[in-house]
């Protein structure tokens, strides 16, 4: 019984199948599009990422149909909203590289009482990196 690792990164989805001694049996990878809008926004099509994941898992499951565990990692600060009823994405994922929230961060930075409170509670300064 082996293991499967899934990494949904900024540029692709990668699945690695390991044997029981953690030796790599096979690596599968599929890139997804980076959507750069004229406004400078950065997004990902969640349906494309989902379809890539399904297709890669089909390939991986031919090598390991009953893994002991599956590990998952993702892009961290990228975020998405899903419809509670349908489970479908409401919009593309907002990628960590996107700066659409920077004007709000600037407002916070220019207000020391709010800015200091955020830094005190989080240890971080307001930054669009954190979506």
Each language-model region and where it sits:
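N-terminal glycine/serine-rich phosphate-binding loop of ATP-dependent small-molecule kinases
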Residues: 1-91, 116, 120
